A protein has these predicted regions:
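A glycine-rich (often HGG/GG-containing) alpha/beta subdomain
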Residues: 2-124
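Glycine/serine-rich phosphate-binding loop and adjoining beta1-alpha1 elements at the start
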Residues: 98-197
Length: 198
């Protein structure tokens, strides 16, 4: 049973989210990191050159975030996350030290929680903000066009949209539902979502 609730075994790989948002970073840093839609393919190409084969880049006023998936195992978590931070820093013309303490890195279950939270607009400055799903969809479309998505990332993103459908209305009407609705069983929700895709 433990294996069944492990996202690594469910997905045969590792979910990873690296970013800077309104809680982790200054507005000045986020402004420097902001990625216009037309620049996203270049960032995705740099990520691919850095060894990241599945990723989307979500850039809004609240965050700049790379949602990624690594097939199989990851030899060095810190090195993998560092490469993503370096790509973002290069885009923002920032030195790595300027990013220190202003970014977050989530792996596996925590990464999936983050994807779900962002998609459902639970991690926004304004909880339940309806524009977020459109921003996620646009980022997903750009990643697909750049051939930067495959089974692992697609599965997580589809589950995130299903999760959003479950929580978005209650959250918009009562933000106090945030913790109980989102964080109770994200991996079980992912399992159920995968089962409906098979």
């Amino acid at each position: 049973m433990a294996e069944k609730s492990n996202p690594r075994s469910l997905l045969n790989g590792r979910a990873l989210v690296v970013g800077a948002n309104h809680r982790s970073s200054s507005m000045i840093l986020r402004d420097r990191l902001f990625v216009e839609d037309e620049a996203v393919p270049f960032i995705l190409e740099r990520l691919k050159n850095a060894g990241i084969d599945q990723a989307l880049v979500l850039s809004t006023c609240d965050r700049v975030e790379v949602q990624a998936f690594c097939d199989g195992d990851v030899a060095n978590e810190d090195e993998t996350a560092r490469r993503i931070v370096e790509v973002l820093a290069e885009h923002g013309e920032l030195g790595p030290s300027e990013m220190d303490g202003q970014t977050y890195v989530h792996w596996d279950e925590q990464a999936i929680r983050q994807v779900f939270a962002v998609t459902a607009s639970l991690d926004s400055l304004i909880i339940g903000e309806p524009q977020v799903l459109g921003q996620v969809k646009a980022s997903h479309r750009i990643a697909k066009d750049a051939e930067m998505t495959s089974t692992g990332l697609e599965t997580i993103l589809q589950a995130g949209r299903k999760h959003m459908a479950v929580v978005s209305v209650p959250v918009r009407t009562n933000p106090k539902t945030r913790e109980s609705r989102l964080f109770k069983h994200p991996i079980q929700f992912l399992e159920q979502s995968i089962a409906t895709m098979l």
